[in-house]
Curated annotation (Swiss-Prot):
Name the record gives this protein: Ribosome maturation factor RimM
SUPFAM superfamilies: PRC-barrel domain (SSF50346), Translation proteins (SSF50447)
InterPro entries found in the cross-reference section: PRC_barrel-like_sf, PRC_RimM, RimM, RimM_N, RimM_N_sf, Transl_B-barrel_sf
GO BP terms in the entry: ribosomal small subunit biogenesis; rRNA processing
GO molecular function: ribosome binding
Residues that span the membrane, as ranges: none
Keyword Nucleotide-binding: no
Cellular component aspect of the GO annotation: cytoplasm; ribosome
Amino acid sequence: MNATPEKADDLIVVGKIFSVHGVRGEVKVYSFTDPIENLLDYPRWTLRHEGKVKQVELVSGRGSQKGLVVKLKGLDDRDEARLLSGHEICISRSLLPNLATDEYYWYQLVGLKVINQDEHLFGKIDHLLETGANDVLVVKPCAGSLDDRERLLPYTGQCVLAVDLEAGVMRVEWDADF
C-alpha cells in the first residue's frame, strides 16, 4: 500500500469498507456507485479515515449479498484487513465519467442554495437520499432562509426547474407551505 495521497480537495467518496471477509485479507465494501460494481472500474483508491489518507491498488472484486468483496494489493491477512474497516474509499473527481449537460453528481449539488418559484430561499442542500422511487434533496436552513424548517424535496424534473453550479443555486417548483 502506498502512503502518497491524492489532493484532499480533489477526492470524492465512492464507497466505504465496512468489514473483513475470510482469512486472506479480503474486505467487504459498500459501494456508492450505481451500479455498485462500477466501483471496481477504478484500479487505484485513496482510503481516508480520521483525517489520514493512503493509496491502495485493487487486485480483484466481486459482488456479494450486501455489497462487494474486494482484494487489495499487499493486504493478505484478516487482522490487517480489519484495520481498514470504516475507511472511506475515494477517487479523484477527474476520473468520474462526463455527464450530459442536465445531469449532475450528488457532490455537485451539495451546498447549493435552493430557491423556489416565488423567490423564497429554503436553505442549502445538505445531502441527498436514495429512496428507490427518486432521489430526495435534504435542504437545511441557512442565513437568509424563509424559515428554520428542514425540507425534503424530490429530485425530479417536476420539482427541479434549473441548476446553476456557477451561481450556486438550484431553482425549484415547491410551495413554501409544504
